[in-house]
Amino acid sequence: MNLELLESFGQNYPEEADGTLDCISMALTCTFNRWGTLLAVGCNDGRIVIWDFLTRGIAKIISAHIHPVCSLCWSRDGHKLVSASTDNIVSQWDVLSGDCDQRFRFPSPILKVQYHPRDQNKVLVCPMKSAPVMLTLSDSKHVVLPVDDDSDLNVVASFDRRGEYIYTGNAKGKILVLKTDSQDLVASFRVTTGTSNTTAIKSIEFARKGSCFLINTADRIIRVYDGREILTCGRDGEPEPMQKLQDLVNRTPWKKCCFSGDGEYIVAGSARQHALYIWEKSIGNLVKILHGTRGELLLDVAWHPVRPIIASISSGVVSIWAQNQVENWSAFAPDFKELDENVEYEERESEFDIEDEDKSEPEQTGADAAEDEEVDVTSVDPIAAFCSSDEELEDSKALLYLPIAPEVEDPEENPYGPPPDAVPSSLMDEGASSEKKRQSSADGSQPPKKKPKTTNIELQGVPNDEVHPLLGVKGDGKSKKKQAGRPKGSKGKEKDSPFKPKLYKGDRGLPLEGSTKGKVQAELSQSLAAGGAISELL
């Protein structure tokens, strides 16, 4: 697909719903890879579903966690995926094989995970009621980032666009800018409302292009800043936001905010309903409101990196928002000018003459001179939309798509070989011996997959009884986690996992698992003893 031909001449934001993506289980979070070709969706049963966004089909399913997936992030080259679940586990996955490379166990719930934009060996983790932690995957070490006050409980953090700095924000409205390599403080400022009142920082998001970033605060205002101005002001600066975005009518609180792929628009999802508000960053005016199904709550929003497409999650389903495709059946003249009606073409006297005797010899300029130039059809130029401003070439090892092979139930070993009768007896004996060797090797236990290394991360002064916000309030933590985890069969009220073998009783379709299994077996034995007839047993 040629992205240059997709350049829209009008508005560059979605206008209407363009279908849904059903992940079978309930979706909680989603994120695009760097090129927008793959969409990773974290589900309620711990699985990660990777969608091929061009075909809108499932390319891979990774059984990642036991508990719900709460945060996802792609590596820069697209080969790795880091995930966090509500049981305080952070894992790194190989996208092609689906294997887990590393696993980290934290003492408190994880609110966000993020790869370093340029170094996929570093991962930023935001634990609940703790300072942010930067993991180094190669040696499994971690560094706790400094905070403004030791009593800071809820601290959010994010890498800037190139990963040179880490921006952190606390519940008192204080923003710290730390150097990524040394964790030194280079700038700081406080977000205030009006005079001196402070407001809590809920999230920090950076644009893919440019130096702008936005801050979502508890006072229901989205503030847009220029990162260069923040660094210029230094410590305890007082920078003014470029824009302040809010819903003045309904005073809507914002669940998730992000920039468009080109950084010219900002989308914010309402925390009250399934509604997306889109603003133009340069002017600050509201250009579009996208309304989903009434009564649904929004969970996550992601904007496509290079196209005007938005993916939002509500009620466990991924909704896609795109532009309205208008078909054009107009007629075009040979010079590609659009015609409103059929026009009879009047040719010039000498237009189709091979040689014009009366024409003088002009100098070749413009299009005539370009006809004599050689056209390079072998070299491939990098696509500007996929390259950063400080890069010249694309990543040749990037993972854009997942290969899919057809599943054959009974493959023939040699469909194009000679028939069995034509094989000599000596070759048949050798084949039989090799077949025995193959069977013996198959009967033996296959080498198990390498178990991922699990590292326990110890954080000082962090309570161990915290419950993730996705699971509800603190208290009955066990029951909450059990309900939110991978579904288990219980009297047919909950869905069964499609990857679990099932045994059904008669036409009622009750899965024989756990305590229900014993109950159904007791009923069966009683009915057999009483001489009852069973119509069907699967």
Swiss-Prot record:
Biased composition (Acidic residues): 344-360
Post-translational modification Phosphothreonine, affected residues: 252
Protein localization: Nucleus
GO CC annotation, single: Set1C/COMPASS complex
Positions annotated as WD repeat: 22-63, 64-103, 148-188, 196-235, 249-291, 293-331
Keywords attached to this entry: Chromatin regulator, Isopeptide bond, Nucleus, Phosphoprotein, Repeat, Transcription, Transcription regulation, Ubl conjugation, WD repeat
Covalent cross-link Glycyl lysine isopeptide (Lys-Gly) (interchain with G-Cter in SUMO2), where: 129
Cited Pfam families: WD40 (PF00400)
Record region (Disordered): 344-377, 408-519
Compositional bias per record (Basic and acidic residues), positions renumbered to this chain: 491-510
Residues in the signal sequence: none
GO BP, one annotated term: transcription initiation-coupled chromatin remodeling
Region feature (Interaction with WDR5): 371-380
Region entry Interaction with ASH2L, spans: 330-366
GO-annotated molecular function: histone binding; transcription cis-regulatory region binding
Gene3D superfamilies, per the entry: YVTN repeat-like/Quinoprotein amine dehydrogenase (2.130.10.10)
Primary subcellular site in the record, as a coarse category: nucleus
InterPro entries: RBBP5/Swd1 (IPR037850), WD40/YVTN_repeat-like_dom_sf (IPR015943), WD40_rpt (IPR001680)
Phosphoserine: residues bearing it: 350, 388-389, 497, 525
UniProt biased composition (Basic residues): 479-490
Subunit structure: Component of the SET1 complex, at least composed of the catalytic subunit (SETD1A or SETD1B), WDR5, WDR82, RBBP5, ASH2L/ASH2, CXXC1/CFP1, HCFC1 and DPY30. Core component of several methyltransferase-containing complexes including MLL1/MLL, MLL2/3 (also named ASCOM complex) and MLL4/WBP7.
Its biological purpose: In embryonic stem (ES) cells, plays a crucial role in the differentiation potential, particularly along the neural lineage, regulating gene induction and H3 'Lys-4' methylation at key developmental loci, including that mediated by retinoic acid. Does not affect ES cell self-renewal. Component or associated component of some histone methyltransferase complexes which regulates transcription through recruitment of those complexes to gene promoters. As part of the MLL1/MLL complex, involved in mono-, di- and trimethylation at 'Lys-4' of histone H3.
Protein name per the record: Retinoblastoma-binding protein 5
Organism listed in the record: Mus musculus (Mouse)
Lineage of the species this protein comes from: Eukaryota, Metazoa, Chordata, Craniata, Vertebrata
Gene name in the database record: Rbbp5
